[in-house]
Structures are given as C-alpha cells and as structure tokens.
Amino acid sequence: MTLLEQYIDCMQKGDCVALADLFTDHGVIHDSSTIKAGMDTLHLEGKMAIEMMFHHKFGFNGGPFPISGIRYFDERIVWYFITYNGKVVPVMATLSEMEDGKIKRLNIYPL
C-alpha cells in the first residue's frame, strides 16, 4: 500500500499508533478541512503529538471518523469525504513532503 492508502486505512480503523508511525519523528499534519465542520484548524508536529491527538479525537468521536468516496489521483493526492460531528466534508489530502519512506508533511484541505 502507498503511504496515502495506509493513512486512509489507519483513519478508517481508528488506529492512532499506526497512523503516527506513518510520519517522521518531526512530521507535520496540517488539516484545515475541519473549518467546514465549525472546528479549528488542526496543526500537529511530531509523531507523539499526532498519536496523542488522534487517540483523543477517536475517543471523543466514539471511534474513527467515517470516510467514503475515496479517489486516489496518484501516490501524493487523494480526495475523500469525511464526517465530522454529523457534517460531511469533501477534502483533498496532499503528501507535500516525504522522507525515508515516511510522511514529513501532509496537508488536508476542504474542497
């Protein structure tokens, strides 16, 4: 599986540990799609921050956020629908930087 396929798989399973392991030690996830659901932009730096935040996000959500309509354009870009608090948000995730087979920076934008 590509890094993005693994990312989507971890998000669908709610596996915060495996999700964090996809990133470099100082990897970044920047997600502004959450604005469309009335939440603040999510900007996390480092594997530990990613694991801890998603542990809490999956916990408070009662499990993983539903993801559907997944369309991969290449190894760096995927579009999908994610549901936050009952609101379906179309998004694009882009692998901006990779290093040693890990994600160095992942940007997620609303469509």
Question: Residue locations for each model-derived region?
Answer:
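A beta-strand edge to alpha-helix "cap/lid" segment located at domain peripheries
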Residues: 55-111
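A solvent-exposed, acidic/Ser-Thr-rich amphipathic alpha-helical stretch
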Residues: 24-68
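Soluble or luminal CAZymes and related metallo-dependent hydrolases
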Residues: 3, 49, 87
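Short, aromatic-enriched amphipathic alpha-helices that serve as compact interaction elements
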Residues: 1-15
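Hydrophobic pocket/interface hotspot
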Residues: 7, 19-20, 27, 46, ...
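Intrinsically disordered, low-complexity boundary segments flanking structured domains
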Residues: 14-17, 66-68
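Short, flexible active-site loop motifs that bind/organize anionic cofactors or intermediates
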Residues: 6-9, 40, 93
